[in-house]
Amino acid sequence: MAKLTKRMSVIRDKVDATKQYDINEAISLLKELATAKFVESVDVAVNLGIDARKSDQNVRGATVLPHGTGRSVRVAVFAQGANAEAAKAAGAELVGMEDLADQIKKGEMNFDVVIASPDAMRVVGQLGQVLGPRGLMPNPKVGTVTPNVAEAVKNAKAGQVRYRNDKNGIIHTTIGKVDFDADKLKENLEALLVALKKAKPTQAKGVYIKKVSISTTMGAGVAVDQAGLNASAN
């Protein structure tokens, strides 16, 4: 058996894997145990009561967290004419059509989010093999294919998170940085859970949000007692 590092030994001693923690206690634990030499992200895993093998029970979408994620986001937009000008005014770093597609084909991908107006999808469609595996392909379900590209750019810059369940029915995303105030992390988590509840597939039966765990980039997961969260998020 591999020897635990000193840091992991401390985490194992502090975190009771069988316990669901009050959200305030959970956040306090994360802050106490976040000893990496960089500001760690706070990540969340939400186990959903869905059958991920069935396409009509998969959950996918996006929501803007009230306090953002703490990340600086670079946005690329496929648009032309007035839409292109609006995207630039909203703060998009890269805006174009065929010229932007050519950059991407050359491997120049200095961006975190790709947004496209519907009329630009004829160009973006050529990039599926490049953008798809990186999770960057624009999609109307998460608001990245839209006639209102300026609003989409503003949302991305404001701390929008995209979510999609994995094959085990678990959503993985981030809700901020460990140096955020505890109240801000809590409110971001509640906002995410509200969005997930709204996205509940009609075919999903039984308990929908089965388990919520939060962790830092380098830390262990801490299970959260949903009773301590905003009732509308449960």
From Swiss-Prot:
Gene Ontology biological process: regulation of translation; translation
Keyword Nuclease: no
HAMAP family in the cross-refs: Ribosomal_uL1_B (MF_01318_B)
Protein name: Large ribosomal subunit protein uL1
GO function terms (MF aspect): rRNA binding; structural constituent of ribosome; tRNA binding
Subunit structure: Part of the 50S ribosomal subunit.
Organism encoding this protein: Klebsiella pneumoniae (strain 342)
Stated family: Belongs to the universal ribosomal protein uL1 family.
Role: Binds directly to 23S rRNA. The L1 stalk is quite mobile in the ribosome, and is involved in E site tRNA release. Protein L1 is also a translational repressor protein, it controls the translation of the L11 operon by binding to its mRNA.
TM region(s), chain numbering: none
Chain's gene name: rplA
Keywords attached to this entry: Repressor, Ribonucleoprotein, Ribosomal protein, RNA-binding, rRNA-binding, Translation regulation, tRNA-binding
GO cellular component: a single term: cytosolic large ribosomal subunit
Highest taxon of the lineage: Bacteria
